[in-house]
Amino acid sequence: MRVLVTGGSGFIGTNLMEHLIDAGEEVLNVDWNPPLDPGQRVLWRELDIMDEEALARAFAEFRPTHVVHLAARTDTEEQHDLNAYVQNHEGTRRLLNAVKACPSVERLIVTSTQFVCEAGHQPKDDLDFKPFTLYGESKRLTEMATREARLSCTWTIIRPTTIWGPWSLRYRDVMFKVMRKGLYFHPSRRKVIRSYGYVGNVVWQIDRILRLPAERMNGRVFYVGDPPFDLRIWVEAVSKALTGRPVRYIPTWVVRALAVTGDVFRTVGLPFPITSGRFRSMTSDYITPMDRTIEALGPAPFTLEQGVKAMVTWYDGGSEHIAHPARKVVGHG
């Protein structure tokens, strides 16, 4: 395979690049940020997917047989202006044009998100959307653009759940740092079922989609990640690996009050370990339908314990020296 990865400098992209390199595939990462892993820099081409001419040149020169489209703005901070996520839906349209103009492309994976459906909404079919954030809406538009593109290659849409693992700067900065200092408290012992995914399993699932027979993958939508589980199991495993101790629990109302305080800090630009959004994600079920993914792709290879061990090893192996990518202005031309 000759695999072109958009957004290969990010969290999932860095892990995917490592996997494909180890598998001996020819790989090109097109991203407007440099790779998190300096060792992958030789395979990076600086490129804004909103730049159609540069994108077309990259395709023409590399001649990929397979494309994995990960590039996106993935936060949920913007609540008023959908155009803040223009690189998601419009960027995907431009990527699709580049794919259509490149006859070597045999397969395409387009990345959406579980947030095209709000928590509690179990979609009846692939077009049963219920986004609850502008980010989720931008990904709904991404999915529709893919369906309407009339692609001649095999295409598949993936919807990642909450993904964790090595190279996640969000978990490094928000959860791990607080937990290692002994400042993490979990809100109550109530069972909360969440759809999470170890990044190694997600990369394995992407690889399966690239390799399985085209007729089984074409036009399909798959949630990628692990089967839903009790969030406490994951939190306890991380705590024991990081600190050697079980998690400490405090009443839900205390954490809710801290979250409100965090909201105030956030409005003035000050960091705080918990906000109302984070509180809701820690105390609300969010279950995605993984059965179809497992049936089509098979069970993923890594256990939760293996994933936690790999992530903590990465965290303790110099992750503090990895800088956050610079914020850039999206080109609309």
Functional labels for PLM-detected ranges:
Residues 117-118, 156-174:
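Flexible, glycine-rich beta-alpha linker
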